[in-house]
From Swiss-Prot:
GO MF term set: adenylate kinase activity; ATP binding; zinc ion binding
Location of region: LID: 126-163
Protein's pathway: Purine metabolism; AMP biosynthesis via salvage pathway; AMP from ADP: step 1/1
Protein source organism: Staphylococcus epidermidis (strain ATCC 35984 / DSM 28319 / BCRC 17069 / CCUG 31568 / BM 3577 / RP62A)
Lineage, opening ranks: Bacteria, Bacillati, Bacillota, Bacilli, Bacillales
GO biological process, one term: AMP salvage
Main location: cytoplasm
Region annotation NMP: where it falls in the sequence: 30-59
Free-text comment on this protein's domains from its UniProt entry: Consists of three domains, a large central CORE domain and two small peripheral domains, NMPbind and LID, which undergo movements during catalysis. The LID domain closes over the site of phosphoryl transfer upon ATP binding. Assembling and dissambling the active center during each catalytic cycle provides an effective means to prevent ATP hydrolysis. Some bacteria have evolved a zinc-coordinating structure that stabilizes the LID domain.
Record's protein name: Adenylate kinase
PROSITE patterns reported in the protein's UniProt record: ADENYLATE_KINASE
């Protein structure tokens, strides 16, 4: 079972990824984890990726694609994988198709967790952090007992700069633009499965598992 997990920031991908790998014996492979592992293992591609990252440059597609191929060829991914954070471009999606073809495998489903942008804004801008102890709150899902004050030590709560509405809105716009052609690509291949991510977490999980059970 070879799965790609997609969704905008705040859609709950991390939560659903955890539930999927609990239910199915496949590794959760995120782009960040892949890079860290390749660099730690000092593979040729890992060293090459590190040289770009150390210079503050974007890692070229051919290096990223090579690292993906190495990772999904490992023993723990032979029965399947859950890929998160890749592909990000049509070129990467086509490269992944080529890799899967070389490995005589295919992508079984692309799970896209859909949440209205307004709801994502609420989720992403509601985070507050205690300036003393670092405890995280959420104005909607996990509010402090007293507005603006930490329950634990009475510290003042603040909003991180990248959680402010303007930054979040820009981030969502970039992600929508980036993901649209990839979703169309997989829809044309007949493997795209859209999930309503605005439901309760357990309901979303049940919907995801139901799709995967029927592959």
């Amino acid at each position: 079972m070879n799965i790609i997990l997609m969704g905008l920031p705040g859609a709950g991908k991390g939560t659903q990824a955890s539930e999927i790998v609990k239910k199915f014996p496949i590794p959760h492979i995120s782009t960040g984890d892949m890079f860290r592992k390749a660099i730690k293992d000092e593979t040729d591609l890992g060293k090459e990726a590190k040289s770009y990252m150390d210079r503050g440059e974007l890692v070229p597609d051919e290096v990223t694609v090579g690292i993906v191929k190495e990772r999904i060829s490992e023993d723990d991914a032979k029965k399947g994988f859950l890929l998160d954070g890749f592909p990000r471009t049509i070129d990467q999606a086509e490269s992944l198709s080529q890799i899967m073809s070389e490995l005589d495998r295919e992508i079984d489903a692309v799970i896209n967790i859909e949440v209205p942008e307004e709801e994502l804004m609420n989720r992403l801008t509601g985070r507050r952090i205690c300036e003393k102890c670092g405890t995280t709150y959420h104005l909607v899902f996990n509010p402090p007992k007293v507005d603006g004050i930490c329950d634990i030590d009475g510290g003042k709560l603040y909003q991180r700069e990248d959680d402010n509405p303007e930054t979040v809105s820009n981030r969502l716009s970039v992600n929508v633009k980036q993901s649209k052609p990839i979703l169309e690509y997989y829809n044309n291949k007949g493997v795209l499965k859209n999930i309503d991510g605005s439901k309760d977490i357990d309901e979303v999980t049940n919907d995801v598992i139901d799709i995967l059970d029927h592959l």
